[in-house]
Amino acid sequence: MKTPHSIEAFLPNAQSSIQRSRLRKKLLAWYGLHRRDLPWRANRDPYRVWLSEIMLQQTRVAAVIEHYREFLRRFPTVEKLAAAREASVLAAWSGLGYYRRARMMHAAAKIIVRAHGGNLPQSEAGLRGLPGIGRYTAAAIASIAYEEPVAVVDGNVERVLQRVLGKRLAGEGLWVAANELLDTNCPGDFNQAVMELGAVICTPRAPQCLTCPVVEMCATRGELAGTVKAPAQEKREIHYALHCRNGDDEVFLVQRALDAPLMAGMWELPELPSPCGAEIPAFSLRHSITITDYTVRVVRAATPAEAPGKWISVGKLHKLALTGLARKIFRKAVIL
């Protein structure tokens, strides 16, 4: 029986199970030959899969690679993560942004150790009971680490499905279509293949249709660009003070409130009024957070303004939960 969102209902080129089987084989063969060599693909350990999926949420692959390796060096197992102090976890996460992900992962690790003997639940349903693990993340972990036959839907999968099927799907319709197309014999690889196709071939702009492994089965040849338009970037200018003493061996930092809506408890440089009077910035840099592009002006000064803060040894900065912007400023100033 055809459901309203079934593949047979809207894909003339894949009406038969034979056509769907061809699509799966072509996509898996392409993935086997052309997939990117990413560190989390070398090991299907559930903890590592979980870590990579959380880090990849709203974060570029290039940025995740460096942090993934360092995080595993500090917390190689779920037990090590559960036993760590939150400040240490946030310090290891510094630079990735969206720190709620780190806090939720830390909380989930404690539950896994306490209630599951240190082993992640082996089903999508069980994984969704943990903090910070939603439908997509649970399906990704379950299919990649445990080969549970469940499909994933993220932005890349949505775009591929809409173009291949020639239909603007949304909500549950996407999940139904993804699960019907899923290769249940190797769901982990198939899910990663669809996401990889969306990331490197079936891109939002200028899709590489000539090199697409399933182009002959695609209903649109890349013409359907998607349903969500990226919001326009807001532009802002902000100013920070870089206070140093003892030959630049110590820097002055302030801590965000523990109940702050963003980056709670993280350490950063004191912000200055904009514009900051007659002070001439020592240097400037660019920084982006979600839909805002910042031009950051940094002023060097010998003594801090009257602000609740703390002098921190430069040698201890790598252990501190710094905001991504603070870390970027220190690198620009050749302090980190």
Residue ranges and their predicted role:
Residues 1-36, 42, 196-336:
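Intrinsically disordered, low-complexity, charged terminal extensions of DNA damage-control enzymes
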Residues 10, 18-21, 26-210, 214-217, ...:
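Catalytic cores of DNA base-excision repair glycosylases
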